[in-house]
């Protein structure tokens, strides 16, 4: 017989006290919806000190609801996933996971990618790898995506295990590791069927804009272009009588970058 709502809530409360463990619930929700995350990323997401996050995660590990995945990255354990399924039965929250795709074909299983967070990282990492043939700086990529370096490295290694990417080289540049990556055949076969990736591949203004602004994402490139324009226009107006031959090329550069940004945005839709 199906459990009543009261019985389910009572069982959940016995595992994680609703009244005293709000932070633990916040962490469980983040791990269930975003996938494995670092303590720094969790701390930034819920605006709580990292020390408090570490203490709360330690309690969740003791309760066997959370497990350490790698380095500073934590994810839901089997018991934690079971708990989340019970929450789902009460609140009807749909979280995609690997257990939901047993009857699907290999392509459908890869497309599902266990949860939406993997889809997010797959698309963004693939874009960066495709455009930046010189290599990928995890520190820079993590900063532009707003995630921790450990989290990004975890997903890069995960996709390498799934044979979607392959790291073919690694070098150090100004004390930062640059990863030379390529898409594997399985990754190409999957990604080239996605409209979002196809648009990016044919978006020449986007590729040029990212190169000129030394950016990995369109959002960061637009921020840099906007900053350049906001600084340039007042300077051009104030020093217009002193710039001489520099003024016209500078003005053309402002207009060119602005138009490039607009066309890159339009072709990305």
UniProtKB/Swiss-Prot annotation:
Keyword field: Activator, Cell membrane, DNA-binding, Membrane, Stress response, Transcription, Transcription regulation, Transmembrane, Transmembrane helix
Species, as recorded: Sulfolobus acidocaldarius (strain ATCC 33909 / DSM 639 / JCM 8929 / NBRC 15157 / NCIMB 11770)
Gene3D superfamilies, alphabetized: Winged helix-like DNA-binding domain superfamily/Winged helix DNA-binding domain
Keyword Magnesium: no
Parts of the chain on the Extracellular side: 240-242
Entry GO CC: plasma membrane
Result of knocking out the encoding gene: Deletion results in diminished flaB expression and strongly impaired swimming motility.
Protein name per UniProt: HTH-type transcriptional activator ArnR
GO molecular function annotation: DNA binding; DNA-binding transcription factor activity
Membrane spanning stretches: 219-239, 243-263
Alphabetical list of Pfam families matching this protein: MarR
InterPro entries: HTH-type_ArnR (IPR053515), HTH_MarR-typ (IPR000835), WH-like_DNA-bd_sf (IPR036388), WH_DNA-bd_sf (IPR036390)
